[in-house]
């Protein structure tokens, strides 16, 4: 699979030969969906909580007499039928949303995503992504010159300058290969990978 090798202006100056084992696989939509959903589920904190009728702090006094008012009978204001009452099936903080994906499936799914990005022209290679200072403005100008509005940058090493320069940019995420995840790969319109990071991706997902 041949990928575009971009310069600082976003122009393709050469071709980068990527191995078919990682960047030339068939797209497996079911597998990609499975690893994306599993990644999102595993990222959940599981701390959301609501109260049932027992946990809501309300008086147990009967709100009005049983008969003679014309209203539906009511026992206490903590009933789920009442405003401010407890939930019938509340979310509990001890819920476990973890989904297990074995390593072989995960590697195959990531390779499938990378292959599809390459076929769609959304994956490109650059020599490096070094910046001289932690200033955001020069890096933003560089991405603008390359016509990149929504971009995931996978760099072999994210030093302090690159991290500080990129963290305040909208629709820009800079990560090292080990932190590349399926959700980010499918979310951003363009994925830019440095040459050294390409070698690491090949080792990880071959």
Swiss-Prot record:
MF-aspect GO terms: rRNA binding; structural constituent of ribosome
GO biological process: translation
Feature: compositional bias, Basic residues: 58-70
Superkingdom classification of source: Bacteria
Keyword rRNA-binding carried by entry: yes
Stretches the record annotates as Disordered: 46-77
Ribonucleoprotein listed as a keyword: yes
InterPro entries assigned: Ribosomal_uL4, Ribosomal_uL4-like, Ribosomal_uL4_dom_sf
GO cellular component, one term: ribosome
Disulfide bonds: none
Entry's transmembrane regions: none
Keyword field: Ribonucleoprotein, Ribosomal protein, RNA-binding, rRNA-binding
Function (record text): One of the primary rRNA binding proteins, this protein initially binds near the 5'-end of the 23S rRNA. It is important during the early stages of 50S assembly. It makes multiple contacts with different domains of the 23S rRNA in the assembled 50S subunit and ribosome.
Protein family per UniProt: Belongs to the universal ribosomal protein uL4 family.
Subunit relationships: Part of the 50S ribosomal subunit.
Name the UniProt record assigns to this protein: Large ribosomal subunit protein uL4
């Amino acid at each position: 699979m041949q990928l575009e090798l971009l310069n600082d202006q976003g122009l393709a100056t050469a071709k980068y030969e990527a191995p078919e084992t990682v960047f030339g696989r068939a797209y497996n939509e079911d597998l990609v969906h499975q690893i994306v959903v599993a990644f999102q589920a595993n990222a959940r904190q599981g701390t959301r909580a609501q109260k049932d009728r027992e946990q809501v702090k309300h008086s147990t006094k009967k709100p009005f007499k049983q008969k003679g008012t014309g209203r539906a009978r009511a026992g206490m204001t903590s009933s789920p039928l009442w405003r401010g009452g407890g939930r019938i099936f509340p979310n509990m903080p001890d819920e476990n949303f973890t989904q297990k994906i074995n390593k072989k499936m995960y590697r195959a799914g990531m390779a499938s995503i990378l292959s599809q990005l390459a076929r769609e022209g959304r994956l490109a290679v650059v020599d490096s992504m070094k910046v001289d200072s932690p200033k955001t403005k020069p890096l933003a100008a560089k991405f603008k010159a390359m016509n990149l509005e929504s971009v995931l940058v996978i760099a072999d090493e994210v030093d302090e300058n690159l991290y500080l320069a990129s963290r305040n940019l909208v629709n820009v995420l800079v990560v090292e290969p080990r932190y590349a995840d399926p959700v980010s790969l499918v979310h951003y319109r363009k994925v830019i990978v440095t040459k050294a990071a390409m070698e690491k991706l090949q080792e990880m997902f071959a």
